């Protein structure tokens, strides 16, 4: 069986934390900020961990990423 390849799109969007969890940036941060209130914009700046339900799928995409 051939080697699995790391999904390059996913690899660029996700970083692994020291404890092995996966950190991602939030969506809705590229434009249309006039429609978003200050609290929402502040919360969008913070990174978020990949949810438990998505973890298995994302780990398959990142087979060899450390």
UniProtKB/Swiss-Prot annotation:
The keyword Ribonucleoprotein is annotated on this UniProt entry: yes
Protein keywords: Ribonucleoprotein, Ribosomal protein
Chain intervals for the UniProt region annotation (Disordered): 1-28
Gene3D superfamilies (UniProt xref): 4.10.410.60
UniProt GO MF annotations: structural constituent of ribosome
UniProt feature, compositional bias: Basic residues: 1-16
Keyword Ribosomal protein (UniProt): yes
GO biological process, one term: translation
PROSITE patterns named among the record's database cross-references: RIBOSOMAL_L35 (PS00936)
Superkingdom, taxonomy of origin: Bacteria
Family annotation (Pfam families): Ribosomal_L35p
Family: Belongs to the bacterial ribosomal protein bL35 family.
Annotated HAMAP family: Ribosomal_bL35 (MF_00514)
Name by which UniProt lists this protein: Large ribosomal subunit protein bL35
Native source organism of the sequence: Staphylococcus haemolyticus (strain JCSC1435)
Taxonomic path: Bacteria, Bacillati, Bacillota, Bacilli, Bacillales
């Amino acid at each position: 069986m051939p080697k699995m390849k790391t999904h390059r799109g996913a690899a660029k969007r996700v970083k692994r934390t020291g404890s092995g969890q996966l950190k991602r940036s939030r969506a809705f941060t590229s434009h249309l900020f006039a429609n978003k209130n200050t609290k929402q914009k502040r919360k969008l700046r913070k990174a978020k961990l990949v949810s438990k339900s998505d973890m298995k799928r994302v780990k398959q995409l990142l087979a060899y990423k450390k």
